Amino acid sequence: MTLLKQFMIVSLMFSGVITIFSTELKSQNLPKWNDEYHKNWWMNHGSVSEFTQSVELLNKQINERLNKDGIVKLSQVPSFFELVANTFCAKYFVVPYLNKHQGSDNASFKQIQKFISNNFNVPGYLTRCSHYKDNKIEVIKILLDLKNKDPKIFADYVKLAIAVSLVWDVEFPDSWPHQNVNNADLPILNPHFSQPYDFIVQSHLNGNLFYDPRRMTIRELCFVVDTPVSTKEKLYAQQIKIKRVNDLEGLYKMIPYDQNRINSNLYTWPYGEYSLIKIGAKNGGICMDQSYFVCQTAKAKGIPSILFMGQGRSGVHAWLGAFDIGSGWDFTVGKWESEKYPVGYALDPQTWSQITNSEMEYYLGSSGDSPSSLRGKVLLALALLNKDSTNFVKLIRYSSSVMPRSIEPWDIEYEWLTNNNADLKSIGRFWSRWIKNFKEESGLKARGQIALLQIFKKLEMKKNYESLSKQIISENKSKRFDLGISIDYEEIKNLQDKLKWREAEDKFIFALNNYGKEKSGGHLFYNLVQPYVHKLYLHKKNDQIEKARSLSRKYIVTNKGTILDNDFIKLFDQIE
């Protein structure tokens, strides 16, 4: 069977779609996008309104060809992906920027025309590396400002500039860098997007970085520029001596562990300014502070890094992921394997949404910045260009089939379903497809299962609910036991809400027996024991509280002087 015939069969099988996935190639001229055409198209408009009309015309041409030839054939047309990337960049980045910022100012329009016409890679980079939640107007503003500072430097470090624009397009969240420091104590002085850009450029020119930022991917660079701390802090971190990325773990040992804070229940930094020199040379810190110190040191040296926090046998712990350009990401720097952490949580620097270490491994392990993923991002852009057409759902699903480990097209489709008031059964089918697609990543799969569980509950499908609930607990008893514990507590809470105290207690005891005491300490306490006991306290169930205390002590082994031990004692002492 020829490759062409294989494509034809796949296109017809996919979602039963024939209309836009037809393989009959019709003659419908599209611009042959190359460097010369790129320059002429971006410059060949006399006004913002003329440019906007031209963008819509280009999008219309693409859609006409799409409807006649189908996406499989169309995506084989030379330069098609660059054509879509430029159309997407123009429609979703440039036009909104011009409409909001001095749209009637001819000089501003000419400036942006010149900017993109002379920087051929910018539309492609933005289309392939942006996220649908990015503040696209602010992205263009940042890029223009960085280009105007020094056009030559910008041309050399364009990927760095793109990374800065995608991270700094919105304010850093209040939860940065972690919850154990007050924002007022952070060493941040008038944060501005030019600061990380200038620092990395100058550090590279001075030979102070591990890697050449011009050779790194935009996604990797996002994990370098995602810090608003002052240049003074970065310079301090930069002078710390390490020879290899593997040496980062050794930095934990140079920071004294502040056991007095644990003993005094002072988990939030109590020493004023949260500076690296205070952590490293004066006050020391607990695991969150140690990991923050090492993470900032890595970034100052141009090493992509991310801080994770998770629950283990002894309670909460912090560690980090660090990127070695030769061997890739290591998500276990400073992690205590004996603690059996099922998962670590962090902030994705591009969206500031929560991400787990297992999700990052899952995505980067197969696709990441691979050609298929980048191709899928352009197909996703094509879907967004058709958001108001009947082709949208078919295109969004096609893009997700090309990059099956990406969550983004699924999030977009779910938003579309809810915005269009889809019924519960339609949303249930969506989550069923999600579960099948993400079956290899337990956290993502469980997200779909839990969502489907709630739909079964709303539809009063009791047998389906009970069956799926048992399945989630069974599948996540070992590696992602935190998910199973959460499902168990949800059932216990439902019984408590109905004042079925004896049944709730039986389920509580079953959960303790089910997970045992080998590895689940922190999650078992914070996700099961603590909320269970709080509910009992509200209803003055003192006998059951005392029974919960004695049972929990059998199953949760705490080490004296740990956060978990403190919180365990504190829970029952407060109730007494």
Stretch-by-stretch model annotation:
Residues 1-11:
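Bacterial N-terminal signal peptides that target proteins for export
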Residues 9-19:
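Bacterial N-terminal signal peptides
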Residues 28-103, 111, 117:
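N-terminal mature-domain "stem" immediately C-terminal to a signal peptide or N-terminal signal-anchor/transmembrane
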Residues 64, 83, 90-281:
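Secondary-structure boundary elements
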Residues 271-273, 277, 288-372:
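Hydrophobic/aromatic-rich core segments of domains that either
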Residues 332-410, 415-425, 437-442:
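Low-complexity, Gly/Ser/Thr/Pro-rich intrinsically disordered linker/tail segments
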Residues 383, 393-576:
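Extended amphipathic alpha-helical coiled-coil/heptad-repeat regions
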